[in-house]
């Protein structure tokens, strides 16, 4: 609820969870970092996944697993791109749960791929949860991970635009 309540950060920066808490704003990536840090306090490993888009912004989500099923926590201006219950058997299933709601202002469905989970514990020595430094290097780490396509070229060519009511609802 905290992530949904705070304003969206439109600045080109990447704050630590400590700074998100202090400044009371976050963009999608900062929100995912914050969620992963809170999930860690509850005993989950701190994991992020990137949802790669075409003609749109990527979306980063914090992952958690309960009883063998994946769920996610995220920050977004779009309510349909936030929390997911832990009911998905695979990361692909989880990624696909965002598909119909992942669209740009032109009404194009834009989600195309998802990353392997990024393990944030590899950045513990840099104190990623509390540092005052910019954390853009964590975002850069996604470029070293494999991505898995969700659609083939034929499927992309056959996509229909988002329904007008859904586009308005955003």
Regions found by a protein language model. Give the residues of each.
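A structural boundary/capping signal
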Residues: 1-170
